[in-house]
């Protein structure tokens, strides 16, 4: 499994492109807002001849969805989002103003493809990501785990050296 991280948008959110030896790929938490961020992700995917199969999100805060429309327009993928964050997803334009100071509309975001449950898996190429419920930062917070590669994508549930933020909409402190 190959993992490439991109630091995106005004919040400095982590976007990941994950691929395997088949060149199938998954884009996780696409926060690409600026043109240079979108160009870097597209160039990486093109240069490595990757084929994005899924756009998945660990939760429904706007900084993890600012690039969803770019992915939808470029590769036709709709975001697959943790169930429990439906209200957050419906409020993306409002979140953009509150959290990022940006005036965006619903048309600036891709339509949700489906809401995920813990029973779902994300399969691409020879790889599989399983879902782990990780509420706290948001009601539907989800981590994606590759057992074969021992890799865990936590979104904002965990930060280096600490737990994730619990002061945003929908969060619950432990």
What does each model-found stretch correspond to?
Residues 1-4, 76, 166, 173-174:
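Accessory terminal helices/loops
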Residues 6-7, 111-114, 133-135:
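Short Gly/Pro-enriched turn/cap motifs at secondary-structure boundaries
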Residues 10, 22, 107-108, 159-161:
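Short glycine-enriched loop/turn motifs at secondary-structure junctions
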Residues 33-124:
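Active-site HxH/HxHxD metal-binding segment of metal-dependent hydrolases
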């Amino acid at each position: 499994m190959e993992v490439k991280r991109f630091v995106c948008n005004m919040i400095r959110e982590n976007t990941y492109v994950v691929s395997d030896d088949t060149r199938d790929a998954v884009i996780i938490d696409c926060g690409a807002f600026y043109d240079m961020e979108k160009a870097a992700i597209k160039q990486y995917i093109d240069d490595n001849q990757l084929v994005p199969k899924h756009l998945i999100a660990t939760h429904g805060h706007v900084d993890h969805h600012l690039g969803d429309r770019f992915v939808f327009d470029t590769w036709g993928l709709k975001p697959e989002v943790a169930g429990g964050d439906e209200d957050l997803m419906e409020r993306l334009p409002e979140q953009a103003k509150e959290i990022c100071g940006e005036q965006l509309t619903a048309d600036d975001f891709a339509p949700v493809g489906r809401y995920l449950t813990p029973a779902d898996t994300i399969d691409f190429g020879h790889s599989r990501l399983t879902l782990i419920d990780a509420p706290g930062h948001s009601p539907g917070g989800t981590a994606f785990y590759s057992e074969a590669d021992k890799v865990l994508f936590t979104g904002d549930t965990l930060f280096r050296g600490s737990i994730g933020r619990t002061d945003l909409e929908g969060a619950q402190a432990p």
